[in-house]
Curated annotation (Swiss-Prot):
GO terms for molecular function: transcription coregulator activity. It comes from the Eukaryota. It comes from Aedes aegypti. Residues 173-203 are annotated as: Disordered. The keyword Transcription regulation applies. Its main location: nucleus. Keywords: Activator, Nucleus, Transcription, Transcription regulation. Component of the Mediator complex. Gene3D superfamilies: 6.10.140.200. This is Mediator of RNA polymerase II transcription subunit 7. GO terms for biological process: regulation of transcription by RNA polymerase II. Belongs to the Mediator complex subunit 7 family.
C-alpha cells in the first residue's frame, strides 16, 4: 500500500515502456502503432493532485487558498524584486532565530512566511508564461521568415546567373548575315558516279549544319 501511494505522488512519471515496445519504427512504418488517447474531459490527476479541464491554466491565488500579498493591478517586475528582497530578509530572520532561540514559536511563522513568498514568486513567474510563449512564437516565425527570404534570394541569384549564361550563349552565336554569306559560298562536291546521290543529300542538309561544317573546315 505504501509503494502504491509513493507511485501516485511521485514527482516523476514511470518509464514510458509503451513507447519503445509499441511505437517501434516497424510498427509506425506499417501503421500498427496505437492511436493517441482522446483528450481528457472533466478531472484528471497529476503529481498526486486533482485538476479539472475547465479550470484556468493559471488559477488565481485566492482559488488556491493563498492570501494575496500584492494588489490586483501592479508592476510585475517591481513586485518580483520586492518579493525577492522580502524572501532574503525573512530567511535571515529565520537564521537568526535558529541561532539565538531555536525553540521560538516564531520559527514556524517564518517558515510559513517563506512558503507564502515562494508561492507568490512562482505565481508571478507563471503569469509570464503566456507572454513567453508569444515571444517564442514570434522569434520562431521571424526565423522562418528570414530563412525563406534567404532561400528566395539564393533562387534569385541562380536565376540571374542562368539569364547571364543564356545571354552570353546568344551573344556568341554568329551573325545571320554572316551565316547567309557562308551558305552562299558552299559549293556541291563532285562525287563522280554518286553525284546525284550526293546532290540529293546536300539538298536535304540544314543550312546551320553546312555552316558548322564550314567552320570546322576552317579550323
Amino acid at each position: 500500500m505504501e509503494n502504491t501511494d509513493a507511485i501516485q505522488v511521485s514527482s516523476f512519471p514511470l518509464p514510458p515502456a509503451q513507447y519503445y515496445k509499441l511505437y517501434t519504427d516497424e510498427n509506425v512504418r506499417n501503421n500498427r502503432a496505437p492511436k493517441p488517447p482522446a483528450p481528457i474531459q472533466g478531472t484528471y490527476q497529476m503529481f498526486g493532485q486533482q485538476f479539472s479541464t475547465e479550470d484556468n491554466i493559471i488559477r488565481p491565488l485566492e482559488a488556491q487558498g493563498f492570501k494575496r500579498l500584492y494588489p490586483q493591478h501592479f508592476d510585475r517586475r517591481k513586485e518580483l524584486k520586492k518579493l525577492n528582497h522580502s524572501l532574503l530578509v525573512n530567511f535571515l530572520d529565520l537564521i537568526d532565530l535558529l541561532v539565538h532561540n531555536p525553540d521560538s514559536p516564531q520559527r514556524a511563522e517564518k517558515i510559513e512566511d517563506l512558503n507564502l513568498l515562494f508561492v507568490h514568486i512562482h505565481h508571478l513567474l507563471n503569469e509570464f508564461r503566456p507572454h513567453q510563449a508569444r515571444e517564442t512564437l514570434r522569434v520562431m516565425m521571424e526565423l522562418q521568415k528570414r530563412q525563406r527570404q534567404e532561400t528566395t534570394q539564393r533562387f534569385q541569384n541562380h536565376l540571374e546567373k542562368v539569364r547571364e549564361m543564356v545571354n552570353n550563349a546568344f551573344a556568341s552565336l554568329p551573325d545571320p548575315a554572316e551565316s547567309d554569306r557562308l551558305n552562299s559560298t558552299v559549293e556541291p562536291m563532285d562525287t563522280g558516279d554518286d553525284g546525284e546521290a550526293g546532290k540529293s543529300r546536300g539538298e536535304g542538309c540544314h543550312p546551320l549544319d553546312r555552316l558548322m561544317c564550314e567552320l570546322v573546315d576552317k579550323m
